[in-house]
From Swiss-Prot:
The keyword Flavoprotein does not apply. Part of the ABC transporter complex MalEFGK involved in maltose/maltodextrin import. Probably responsible for the translocation of the substrate across the membrane. Residues 1-16, 58-69, 307-318, 393-412, 507-514 are cytoplasmic. It is a multi-pass membrane protein. It holds the Pfam family MalF_P2. The complex is composed of two ATP-binding proteins (MalK), two transmembrane proteins (MalG and MalF) and a solute-binding protein (MalE). One of its GO terms (molecular function) is ABC-type maltose transporter activity. This is Maltose/maltodextrin transport system permease protein MalF. Residues 37-39, 93-283, 342-369, 436-483 are periplasmic. It is found in: Cell inner membrane. The gene is malF. One of its GO terms (cellular component) is maltose transport complex. Belongs to the binding-protein-dependent transport system permease family. MalFG subfamily. It comes from Escherichia coli O157:H7. Residues 281-505 form the ABC transmembrane type-1 domain.
Length: 514
């Protein structure tokens, strides 16, 4: 007789499909919202990941994919999606002055107004639970008063000329400030039909829209008569001359447009960007290579020393040498920043007492770079030492015994046996270390902040900047505005450079050991 296994209520198919249906509706709603807001890339990504997840968890045939999907979704969301966004921004003029869409920038400009008529002093007087608005003309001495009204909506108030003062005490500045938004929504209509609106905390004045949108998409300045046309090459409304050519004036805010390869060509054609970019690229490669070499060399030598059988207190030495790895790197970096202080740092005090010198660690490019390499070696050698300590255990003692019988010394053992046997398994880790130091943002940012600065550059750049720090400074610290498009272009180039260097290193390693 077949045994029918009883299902719990939470295992029922009805509940499963209900939950999946609700999730599908929620995802659909979010995708529509993103699409309506113009966030097309976010909408597409959410739709793809959510649809794939719902299909995998709803279909029994895709059961095996349930174990793979979370990792793939995470990689797509946190690796591929930011990469695609960065590359997409690199082909636009997206910056602090060009963040809005064309429609939103046009709306902001059309909302601007200018004072085009008389100015009237105003007062606000209580009328029970309501208020009365009183205006006075300083030139003619005429007074105008509205009927009682309540705050809370856009409204038009018809004012009448009066000679009597309103009853009650005039509202003070605090009350006016608290109701400033409501007062800004009021349009006061004078007996002659002129309309005035609040222009300051004490005045109403005749205001008109500063710009008028013409049928051909041109904006006309109602105050000066200048016409502006959208220039989709630069993403601004730009003035046009009488003969139809572009003028010099641009209206802010601008809007985001596609610029093609402009940001990439700027990197190689604009001397103010090209020179610091190439110099920073060379320094980044040199910094990464020297750091990898020194950390591996120091770590390997120390690992051999603490594994030496004749050494007493090896456990204590191991703990002391691994301590830099246990301390968070940002704490160590800030401590070194104090130690290297040019005026009060302990390192300069010691060098001054012993040799009579006080290096300018933060103002001289050479000593600043030397300081970075010293600090980075201190931070990186414990990791390499731990790896080498583990790898040394895998080297058979027979090799050293045989070399001892041949009369080999410690140096011959190290260069003929230890180094060749350690360098092969360390190679992939050295490549990973190179890639990490190529983008070692935290060290530069906390220790030198890229300084000392380079002179005569279009973008902010320093002698100790790595490419990633240079990109950050362009995006967030530019004196002429934050240029996200150019920063994204440089970030894309960094991605290609790191990827190419990693591929070359891997192929070179494979050729060497094959």
């Amino acid at each position: 007789m077949d045994v029918i296994k009883k299902k719990h209520w939470w295992q029922s198919d009805a509940l499963k499909w209900s939950v999946l249906g609700l999730l599908g509706l929620l995802v659909g709603y979010l995708v529509v919202l993103m699409y309506a807001q113009g966030e097309y890339l976010f909408a597409i990504t959410t739709l793809i990941l959510s649809s794939a997840g719902l299909y995998i968890f709803a279909n029994r045939k895709a059961y095996a994919w349930r174990y793979v999907y979370p990792g793939m979704a995470g990689m797509g969301l946190f690796v591929l999606f930011p990469l695609v966004c960065t590359i997409a921004i690199a082909f636009t003029n997206y910056s602090s002055t060009n963040q809005l869409t064309f429609e939103r920038a046009q709306e902001v400009l059309l909302d601007r107004s200018w004072q085009a008529g008389k100015t009237y002093n105003f007062g606000l007087y209580p009328a029970g639970d309501e208020w009365q608005l009183a205006l006075s003309d300083g030139e003619t001495g005429k007074n105008y008063l509205s009927d009682a009204f309540k705050f809370g909506r856009e409204q038009k108030l018809q004012l009448k000329e009066t000679t009597a003062q309103p009853e009650g005490e005039r509202a003070n500045l605090r009350v006016i400030t608290q109701n400033r938004q409501a007062l800004s929504d009021i349009t006061a209509i004078l007996p002659d039909g002129n309309k005035v609106m609040m222009s300051s905390l004490r005045q109403f004045s005749g205001t008109q829209p500063l710009y008028t949108l013409d049928g051909d998409g041109t904006l006309t300045n109602n105050q000066s008569g200048v016409k502006y046309r959208p220039n989709n090459q630069i993403g601004f409304y730009q003035s046009i001359t009488a003969d139809g050519n572009w003028g010099d004036e641009k209206l802010s805010p601008g809007y985001t447009v596609t610029t093609g390869w402009k940001n990439f060509t700027r990197v190689f054609t604009d001397e103010g960007i090209q020179k610091p970019f190439l110099a920073i690229f060379v320094w980044t490669v040199v910094f990464s290579l020297i750091t990898v070499f020194l950390t591996v060399a120091v770590g390997m030598v120390l690992a051999c020393l603490v594994q030496w059988e004749a050494l007493r207190g090896k456990a204590v030495y191991r703990v002391l040498l691994i301590l830099p790895y246990a301390v968070p790197s940002f704490i160590s970096i800030l401590i070194f920043k104090g130690l290297f202080n040019q005026s009060f740092g302990e390192i300069n005090m010691m060098l001054s007492a012993l040799f009579g010198v006080k290096p300018a660690w933060f103002s001289d490019p050479t000593t600043a770079r030397t300081m970075l390499i010293i600090v980075n070696t201190w931070l990186g050698y414990p990791y390499m030492m731990i790896l080498c300590m583990g790898l040394l255990k895998a080297i058979p003692d027979d090799l050293y015994e045989a070399s001892a019988m041949d009369g080999a010394g410690p140096f011959q053992n190290f260069f003929k046996i230890t180094l060749p046997l350690l360098i092969k398994p360390l190679t992939p880790l050295m490549i990973a270390s190179f890639a990490f130091n190529f983008n070692n943002f935290v060290l530069i940012q906390l220790l030198t902040n890229g300084g000392p600065d380079r002179l005569g550059t279009t973008t902010p750049a320093g002698y100790t900047d790595l490419l990633v720090n240079y990109t950050y400074r362009i995006a967030f610290e530019g004196g002429g505005g934050q240029d996200f498009g150019l920063a994204a272009a440089i970030a894309t180039l960094i991605f290609l450079l790191v990827g190419a260097l990693a591929i070359v290193n891997l192929k070179a390693t494979r050729m060497k050991f094959d």
